């Protein structure tokens, strides 16, 4: 076979491989939506687009690109929103901006007055569902008026309010174990108005705790809204 023929074949092979695409965080993939096979689509009212300021470079390794559409995720039939209006506590007793009640008030808009800001370093918020429940999804909006990625995002579920026993970790993108809860295998992601859906995997617990450790724009921690979906116990 001539050298030119070999080069043509190599070029075709590379072209076909690139057509396979990659995970752009757009919700769903070649294998279909995530979540429970045979389940029903999880739906929530999405906030309008609002981009302010100049984003800073995001240098997080293995970063998932910003999605171009709402995520596709399936949950068991009968799954309900469990977190609306529920009590939220935090490792930061006095948030810099906003009130912890904003996390479960149902409003996902960006901008001043819609988010709570916690101090720097590793911090957590915790939602009390009121009873031990089967959790199938945790939908998170940290801050979406600027493209950024939050560091050391860990999501845990437990019946223990102190999170010392019976803890199930359903998401962890702390790749270097900064938070001292084990190295996570999940990838950091870019914040958008579509939020981030974490698979609850049917974990049971009354409390849902979310950690973060600053972001690519500044050292603070933010939450606009967190929605916990599942079946009450």
Predicted regions and their residues:
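Predominantly extracellular/luminal regions of secreted and cell-surface proteins
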Residues: 71-107
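Ser/Thr/Gly/Pro-rich low-complexity, disordered linker/stalk segments of secreted
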Residues: 21-31
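A short beta-strand element within beta-rich, extracytoplasmic domains
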Residues: 88, 134-145, 210
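Trp- and acidic/polar-enriched beta-sheet ligand-binding modules for extracellular glycan
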Residues: 32-53, 117-123, 145-233
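A short glycine/threonine-centered beta-strand motif
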Residues: 129-131, 158
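Sec-dependent signal peptide recognition
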Residues: 2-9
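C-terminal motif of bacterial Sec signal peptides marking the signal peptidase cleavage site
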Residues: 17-18
């Amino acid at each position: 076979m001539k050298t030119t023929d070999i080069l043509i074949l190599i070029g075709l092979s590379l072209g076909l491989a690139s057509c396979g695409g990659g995970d752009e965080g757009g919700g769903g993939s070649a294998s279909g939506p995530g979540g429970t096979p045979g389940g029903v689509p999880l739906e929530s009212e999405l906030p309008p687009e609002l981009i302010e300021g100049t984003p800073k470079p995001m240098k997080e390794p293995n970063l998932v690109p910003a999605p171009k559409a709402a995520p596709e995720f399936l949950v068991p039939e009968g799954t309900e929103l469990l977190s609306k209006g529920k009590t939220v506590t935090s490792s930061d007793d006095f948030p810099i901006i906003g009130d912890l009640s904003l996390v479960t008030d149902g409003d996902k808009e960006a901008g001043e007055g819609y988010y709570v800001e916690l101090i720097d370093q590793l911090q957590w918020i915790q939602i009390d569902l009121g009873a031990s429940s089967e959790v199938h999804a945790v939908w998170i909006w940290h801050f979406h008026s600027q493209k950024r990625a939050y560091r050391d995002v860990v999501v845990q579920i437990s019946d223990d309010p102190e999170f010392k026993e019976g803890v199930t970790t359903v998401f962890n993108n702390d790749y270097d174990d900064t938070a001292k809860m084990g190295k996570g295998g999940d990838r950091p992601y870019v914040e958008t108005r579509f939020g981030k859906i974490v698979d609850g995997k049917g974990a049971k617990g009354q409390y849902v705790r979310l950690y973060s450790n600053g972001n690519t724009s500044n050292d603070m921690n933010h939450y606009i809204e967190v929605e916990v979906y599942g079946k009450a116990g």
